[in-house]
A protein has these predicted regions:
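Flexible, low-complexity junctional segments that flank or bridge functional domains
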Residues: 1-191
């Protein structure tokens, strides 16, 4: 795929390194940063089966998680319970923001981490990645790894909007270490 797409690997890696580190590679970097850099480069090749894995990190697999799932329908993001039994809030089904960050901004940030495909597939995969809190929560300031982990587990706000788009509601939720999974929907017994 590298040669089919005409990608200059060295240039692609250098560009992604500059996205993370404006002064070039540091002497030491967290493994997650290396995984993110390599994942973005690899996704440019367009191989949907390619992935970067580390014993410390795998994209979309790190705790903590949202205590709900997200889905895309007609260009809107809907929130539903982690067991998929109902919407998170049936009167306010659509997500406006996560932790004060617009949901569309959260989605757009993760598109480069997904291999080339149809716009619908890319969006669906990006929305799915948002179940991992670290995919949308930003940590400002210094601190070590333990400090970042502690901050990742803080409660967060989910702003929802009604079907007609006229009313909003904000829920304060706590991240969970239990990964919600996307299964068959609707459940087979409801067909």
């Amino acid at each position: 795929y590298l040669h089919l797409k005409g990608i200059d690997l060295d240039e692609a890696i250098e560009k992604e390194v500059r996205n993370y580190y404006s002064k070039g590679l540091p002497d030491r970097m967290p493994p997650v940063d290396l995984v993110m850099i390599l994942q973005r480069v690899l996704m440019q090749f367009g191989d949907g089966h390619a992935d970067v894995r580390s014993t410390n990190f795998r994209l979309g697999e790190g705790e903590p998680f949202n205590p709900f799932l997200l889905g895309d329908t007609d260009g809107k993001v809907v929130a539903f319970r982690s067991d998929r039994s109902d919407l998170l809030d049936p009167k306010y089904p659509f997500v406006v923001s996560l932790d004060g960050r617009p949901i569309e901004v959260c989605i757009e940030e993760w598109i480069p981490f997904i291999s080339a495909g149809s716009p619908q597939l890319i969006r669906r995969r990006a929305v799915g990645l948002l179940r991992e809190v670290s995919m949308w929560r930003r940590i400002d300031g210094g601190g070590g790894f333990r400090d970042i982990e502690r901050k990742m587990h803080r409660p967060f706000a989910v702003e929802l909007v009604s079907k007609d788009g006229k009313k909003t509601r904000t829920l304060e939720l706590k991240p969970t270490d239990r990964k919600p999974t996307y299964r068959e929907w609707p459940r087979s017994e409801s067909r």
